[in-house]
């Protein structure tokens, strides 16, 4: 069984990813369209894909579409610094296809099996987001399968409404089949400065300052994120791409990246290859591998290196979901209720970050948490007023409440609490997640929709585009072949 698991996972190291070419792409699109048109018109459809990075349920009543021919890189143009990519291509493959050219996507989400199409329709952030925004902001053009069964090409000049409203639509408007994206030149190494903080106020001020100036202590910063262990212990990691060769750390073996950040005071320095920097969080799924014992030194020595990756930990999570292993073997014998999963990425402004962190660490024992600043990419304000339906929104990307020139701090926490954490008389049912939603709303924030959400329709509309999701859906999916945005992200359709 272990041999099969290893065989079914690709190496954690780089592999050669040759372009699939346009002929194979057209064949993949034809296969997708045949599967779409084979589904009765009164039945809903979804992608029949092997991977998912969503932490919410979904209905099994939809017919799966065949996307097996749409998971590659079509071509890379090193002169124009662009790539033509199929929607189901993972970032792991995309990075391995572009790095040999000295190029990489502007923003690479943290986990290897996130797909380019998924990151664009479902958002994604990483340490370059304070400079380069979100993954969809470096998209030049998309082909999208809509609910009518048509492949619609959209860009800043063509079908602009769909181009602006597709990000954060989570498949409610269709699926990206092809994406043409910009790439950035990148150097082979990354120097890290890991700065220790002892209070949330100075942490938040520094996040805001570096996000605006792109420098720290007069040195340019290319990547910025952070980890908070407690109110007295937090770190910001300032990354700088460099050509300078030298020794590098390897966190795919015995050492654990987030633990390496911890030091008493001042600045710790580290160096990684650019590929290891891109995937520094995937090896231990940030820190979530500890739930499976993978950070225990004895276990780590025998844990196959090839299985130190988020996609394998996901398989373990799915086993637990299917058979309720933790509940049946640990909690139920002790008379304890089921645990409440608390997996969220919320966003607040820097001035509200200290209050949220103070509250969160008092309200739960969950630690550590991840910090990642976001600013929309420069020039994106030109999209405002573009299109017909989308022109009604002051946001460049109307289904997500970010504005140009404003810094937001993504706060990620991925753990759980006891089922009776909030109310012993009413365990479970998302109680603590609802409390978090209320606190974030109180602070004028919002959250990503990849996990459970409990907003009322009215609250949801205030945050995620008002009636625009329904208005664009009436054009691209008049027969409702895909679930609506609220239906999909809150009602788990």
Named regions from a protein language model:
Residues 46-47, 222-229, 341, 346, ...:
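A short glycine-rich, hydrophobically flanked beta-strand micro-motif that places a catalytic Asp/Glu
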Residues 323-331, 420-421, 428-493:
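Activity-critical C-terminal alpha-helical subdomain
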Residues 19-113, 117-128, 371, 440:
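Glycine-rich N-terminal segment of FAD-binding domains in flavoprotein oxidoreductases
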Residues 49-56, 227-233, 318-322, 373-388, ...:
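A glycine-rich phosphate-binding loop feature that marks nucleotide/adenosyl-phosphate handling sites
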Residues 1-24:
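Intrinsically disordered, low-structural-confidence terminal and linker regions
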Residues 60, 235-248, 310-321, 333-334, ...:
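Short glycine/threonine-rich loop-to-helix capping motif typified by GTGT followed
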Residues 121, 140-355, 362-365:
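C-terminal substrate-binding/cap subdomain adjacent to the FAD-binding core in PCMH-type
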Residues 348-354, 358-363, 367, 409-410, ...:
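Extended C-terminal subregions enriched in glycine
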